Amino acid sequence: MEIQSLDGVLGEELAIQNEVKKILLSHKTTKAILPLAPISQFSKWKIPKQGFYAPIDVKFVLTPHISERAQVRGVVKLVDSRDLSPSRELYRSKEFNIGHGLVIEGSQLPFCLPVGDYPLQFEVTVLQSQFRETANLYSTSVEWRMMSSTTPLSRVRSVMGAAQQPAMKLQPNFKMSLESSKGGGMKPHQKKSSKPNGHSRRGNLSGEVGGSSSSLPSGAQTGEWIDNDYGDGSSEYSGVST
């Protein structure tokens, strides 16, 4: 139950001063909160518990489980979970239709943070919904690399003032599902029904709507497990050093 690297277990590998490690991490869940930090809650991750880190090559994907016709609206935020001031909101997407799905990417986020002191996390907030429960409206996944060092990373700016900089970009992910559903057609034995009260398939979307974590790169992953500590039995974690 720990992250494995190609050379063994990650942990005491930052003994050399100024050595920079890059670790690939991924996480999938149906919860509204998705961490982007090596916080102590994930003690099973044998990641250095001191030093500094910066998230790079971040890809957050929201996969809808509902039709866009439901008109469920929401926003995605990247926040500092220990800061209660307005500046805790480091990034906020525009309001969007959750049924369309969403992809948020950031190549070089301007965060250079002490490990464990500033746990960052994505938060999905449903603003408008006709459903009483929101737990099954979507699933989220994030894949990112953690650049870690025993000393502050000079290539990465401080977190101060980062909220004012457009470090991330987003785009609807619904077009991906339309492209993947092309050419499906009807099976040969299926015929159109002329009955006025026949069952209609209108409004049903393919399970590929919005993409999924399977679309994220996974060739380099060497460890994967189910973790219930975060309150979600379907959460999946994996990681590998690069």
Swiss-Prot record:
Compositional bias annotation for Basic residues: 188-202
Domain of life of the native organism: Viruses
Residues annotated as signal peptide: none
Protein name: Movement protein
Protein family according to the UniProt entry: Belongs to the tombusvirus/aureusvirus movement protein p22 family.
Any one Gene Ontology BP term: transport of virus in host, cell to cell
Function text: Transports viral genome to neighboring plant cells directly through plasmosdesmata, without any budding. The movement protein allows efficient cell to cell propagation, by bypassing the host cell wall barrier.
Biased composition (Low complexity): 203-223
Key words of the record: Transport, Viral movement protein
Highest classification ranks of the organism: Viruses, Riboviria, Orthornavirae, Kitrinoviricota, Tolucaviricetes
Keyword Transport: yes
Organism of origin: Pothos latent virus (isolate Pigeonpea/India)
A cellular-component GO term for this protein: viral capsid
Positions of the UniProt region annotated as Disordered: 162-242
Pfam families: TBSV_P22 (PF03558)
KW Transport (keyword) present: yes
